[in-house]
UniProtKB/Swiss-Prot annotation:
Keywords from the named record: ATP-binding, Ligase, Magnesium, Manganese, Metal-binding, Nucleotide-binding, Purine biosynthesis
Pfam families: GARS_A, GARS_C, GARS_N
Protein name: Phosphoribosylamine--glycine ligase
Family assignment from sequence similarity: Belongs to the GARS family.
Gene of this entry: purD
Phylogenetic classification of the source organism: Bacteria, Pseudomonadati, Pseudomonadota, Betaproteobacteria, Burkholderiales
Organism of origin: Ralstonia nicotianae (strain ATCC BAA-1114 / GMI1000)
InterPro entries: ATP-grasp, ATP_grasp_subdomain_1, PreATP-grasp_dom_sf, PRibGlycinamid_synth_ATP-grasp, PRibGlycinamide_synth, PRibGlycinamide_synth_C-dom, PRibGlycinamide_synth_C_sf, PRibGlycinamide_synth_N
Length: 422
């Protein structure tokens, strides 16, 4: 069968890589793909981003189903468009994707359905937002209401930072429409974890747990990024906590969406904060797999992803269980010079090691032109190592990272430090 993955990042490369391993899959189209998907003989890049043209392509080629990687096409309604044409697609509708595309929608939804989260208020007026922050004090969290490519959250440790974030979003309009309203919430302390499930509208199956590293620099210093590395499983999510998250957060979300007349089909990612007592609260929802969490999760997944998504699209996930490699997978992101500001493009990449049983490299910001692989975006590669312990997986990943060269490459040297400390 033919399947299609929409997107061009490391997450999409990992999804396409996993789908291509299914005996039922003849070809995986990746639209538009990247340099890594271009190099893989089992994958075929399709230089299309327009949803209407993609739908026509899927129809013409007899694509069995399409899976959407990034948030922007989901928020723009690609699922609604494909479904209206009778095409099978995995992802939430535009209305359901508001769980990610509007922070205010998500917070109001959680409050309405009793899902644990931080207290908050939403503002469109800078003066009112400044007054609220002065009343509440710091630390405090300022979030752009709309999609801001992972750059719309400021964890302000001082009042000065909080006021600066409000001005940046509401007064200076630096995030455009995404920052036309801000959600201001209480600061939650603890350890973060990513909890991702596959939903079919009624039932869910949980993906392996994971934990990512948002900050640019070692020791969780420097600015926030889209993510500099991740590992799976996340030891902070114990079996007891896993059951609690499903019971208190995931299932009430799926039931709540159904109750509100917006049934949720697709990947659902709950960003969690686990406090010192082991109590989970929801920081955010994403309507897709995380990046870079997808890369280590796919490296560990033993179940055929084609079967999982095929059943989810048909609403038949009930009773399905997933099988996982017992090893830890740890992914290190290699980013371009000057990321996360204005990353440099066009640096030649060499030395990417061949895939082995214990390491695989997923591409993100790469382009293949005239046989040369060059950088084309902020996060360039995610190098995944697999081993029996976090420490050994870390060694496997960094062993591969050290073989790869491109000018200005930057990466953290401590991915997995929280798990190793435990």
């Amino acid at each position: 069968m033919k399947v299609m993955v929409v997107g061009s990042g490391g997450r999409e490369h990992a999804l396409a890589w996993k789908l291509a391993r299914s005996p039922k899959v003849q070809v995986v189209y990746v639209a538009p793909g990247n340099g890594g998907t271009a190099l893989d003989k089992r994958l075929q890049n399709v230089p299309i981003t327009d949803p209407e043209v993609l739908a026509a392509f899927a129809e013409r080629e007899g694509v069995h189903f399409t899976v959407v990687g990034p948030e922007a096409p989901l928020a723009a309604g690609i699922v609604d468009l494909f479904r209206a044409k009778g095409l099978r697609i995995f992802g939430p509708t535009r209305a359901a994707a508001q769980l990610e595309s509007s922070k205010d929608f998500a917070k109001a939804f959680m409050q309405r359905h009793g899902i644990p989260t931080a207290k908050y208020q939403t503002f469109g007026n800078a003066a009112e937002a400044h007054a609220y922050v002065d009343r509440e004090g710091a630390p405090i969290v300022i979030k752009a209401d709309g999609l801001a490519a992972g750059k719309g959250v400021v964890v302000a440790m001082t009042l000065e930072e909080a006021h600066g974030a409000i001005d940046m979003m509401l007064a200076d309009n630096r995030l455009g429409d995404a920052g036309a309203r801000v959600v201001i919430e209480e600061f939650l302390a603890g350890e973060e974890a990513s909890f991702i499930v596959v939903c079919d509208g009624k039932d869910v199956v949980a993906m392996a747990t994971s934990q990512d590293h948002k900050r640019l620099l070692d020791g969780d210093a420097g600015p926030n990024t889209g993510g500099m590395g991740a590992y799976s499983p996340a030891p902070v999510v114990t079996p007891t906590l896993h059951a609690r998250v499903l019971r208190e957060i995931i299932l009430p979300t799926i039931r709540g969406m159904e109750k509100d007349g917006i049934p949720y089909t697709g990947f659902l990612y709950a960003g969690l904060m686990i406090d010192a007592d082991g109590t989970p609260k929801t920081l955010e929802f994403n309507c897709r797999m995380g990046d870079p969490e997808t890369q280590p999760i796919m490296a560990r997944m033993k179940t055929d992803l084609f079967d999982v998504l095929d059943r989810a699209i048909d609403g038949k996930l009930d009773g399905m269980e997933l099988d996982w490699d017992r090893r830890t997978a740890l992914g290190v992101v290699m980013a371009a010079y000057n990321y996360p500001d204005t990353p440099r493009k066009g640096d030649v990449i060499t030395g990417i090691p061949k895939e082995t049983e214990d390491s695989v490299t997923f591409h993100a910001g790469t382009t293949l032109k005239d046989g040369a692989l060059t950088t084309s975006g902020g996060r360039v590669l995610c190098v995944v190592g697999l081993a029996d312990t976090v420490k050994a997986a870390q060694r496997a990943a960094y062993g591969a990272v050290e073989q790869i060269q491109f000018d200005g490459a930057q990466y953290r040297k401590d991915i997995g430090h929280r798990a190793i400390r435990r």
